[in-house]
């Protein structure tokens, strides 16, 4: 039977076309549907013969896991056990959208899930009453097939229905991510957190979204505040990141992948200033580079986006609480004893060393609080 290629009507209800696509899926026919990333072969996962046919057409081995596309984020709960909170934050940010999540299923295996950001295809999924597989194709001699023209040129003889919604907006595959469970890896006085909230978000495929996009969207932000954001607060953020990295058995750079973003700002900062010479030197003595730090002025948005805000002195505490009084309970002095961390600005290297030591003592207590609060929700 010749391919039926149907343009998606921009100015009328596509309900009849939705019904036709659903009927074709249930009959085990070969469809191509659009998404915001690339077009793909659509198949009903309850039809094993149709699923294997699409695997063969796309060069996938028998039994290869395919991504289940859902109509809405709410459908997730029926597919897998509740994921960790940080994964939910990620899905709330990027679903519908170009993110595929590999989540633990009820049987312990991984389930690949996505909610595409294409109204027509989501309407088809919703009307079908179940998720569908939407499978991209990348023939060896053609590379990735992005749009309707590509599929028509290569698979016209094998396609029953192709819904043409024009070129896909992104023309790039989704990013695929999975959560690797955390576990104690480094012996020491503090026990490494084993909650799934601290597992590493591993990118199995980098597509439209970068690693930074994914990690930042899922992370809890911990904000340190001083005056100019050139001495104490950047040093505190860097020391907290280093202590967390050692605890989790990872590098400073990959702490973000484990769900924590340590940031800093100043209540009277001039944006774009480098770290002070003293802080650069004090950090370098413990193997931390602050060369790329640039100061940022504290604002309400930073506070509202942070899980906790730690101020280096009483004046910073007052200023931060005045900016966001509704978050006052989450804004505290870094020193649990209520003392401010001494300001070394303009002093000798020994002054910066004393400040570094005071920050380390305060962090030794505060990090346990942070880990416990995140694990408890």
Stretch-by-stretch model annotation:
Residues 4, 131, 161, 261, ...:
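Conserved beta-strand segments of alpha/beta enzyme cores
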Residues 6, 113, 176, 290, ...:
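Short clusters of hydrophobic/aromatic residues that line enzyme substrate/ligand-binding pockets
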Residues 219-306, 370-376:
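Conserved active-site segments centered on acidic
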Residues 58, 244-248, 320-324:
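Conserved hydrophobic residues forming the short capping helix/wall of the S-adenosyl-L-methionine
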Residues 54, 76-79, 236, 240, ...:
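Hydrophobic packing residues within well-ordered alpha-helices of enzyme cores
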Residues 135-139, 200-202, 308, 314-377:
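Phosphate-binding/catalytic loops
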Residues 70, 311-312:
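Short beta-strand scaffold positions
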Residues 1-223:
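Active-site-adjacent structural elements in enzyme catalytic cores
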């Amino acid at each position: 039977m010749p391919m039926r290629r149907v343009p998606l009507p921009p100015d009328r209800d596509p309900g009849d076309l939705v019904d036709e696509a659903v009927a074709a899926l249930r009959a085990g026919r070969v469809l191509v549907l659009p998404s915001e990333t690339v077009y793909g072969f659509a198949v009903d996962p309850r039809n094993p013969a149709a699923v294997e046919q699409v695997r063969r057409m796309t060069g996938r081995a028998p039994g290869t896991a395919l991504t289940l596309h859902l109509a809405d984020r709410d459908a997730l709960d029926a597919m897998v056990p509740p994921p960790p909170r940080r994964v939910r934050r990620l899905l709330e940010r990027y679903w519908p959208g170009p993110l595929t999540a590999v989540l633990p299923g009820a049987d312990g295996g991984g389930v690949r899930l996505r909610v595409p950001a294409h109204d027509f295809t989501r309407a088809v999924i919703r009307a079908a009453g179940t998720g569908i597989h939407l499978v991209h194709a990348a023939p060896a001699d053609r590379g990735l097939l992005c749009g309707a023209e590509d599929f028509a040129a290569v698979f016209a003889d094998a396609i029953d229905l192709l819904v043409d919604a024009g070129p896909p907006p992104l023309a790039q595959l989704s990013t695929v991510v999975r959560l690797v469970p955390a576990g104690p890896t480094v012996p020491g006085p503090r026990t490494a957190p084993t909650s799934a909230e601290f597992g590493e978000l591993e990118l199995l495929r980098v597509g439209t979204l970068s690693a930074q996009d994914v990690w930042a969207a899922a992370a809890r932000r911990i904000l340190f505040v001083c005056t100019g954001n050139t001495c104490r607060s950047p040093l505190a953020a860097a020391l907290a990141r280093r202590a967390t990295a050692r605890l989790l058995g990872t590098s400073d750079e990959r702490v973000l992948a484990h769900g924590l973003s340590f940031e800093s700002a100043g209540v009277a900062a001039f944006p774009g200033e480098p770290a002070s010479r003293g802080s650069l030197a004090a950090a370098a003595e413990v193997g931390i580079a602050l060369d790329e730090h640039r100061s940022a002025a504290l604002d309400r948005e930073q506070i509202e986006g942070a899980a906790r805000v730690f101020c280096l002195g009483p004046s910073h505490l007052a200023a931060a609480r005045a900016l966001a009084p509704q978050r006052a309970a989450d804004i505290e002095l870094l020193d649990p004893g209520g003392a401010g961390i001494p300001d070394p600005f303009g002093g000798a290297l020994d002054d910066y060393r004393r400040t570094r030591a005071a920050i380390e003592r305060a962090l030794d207590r505060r990090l346990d609080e942070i880990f416990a609060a995140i694990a408890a929700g």
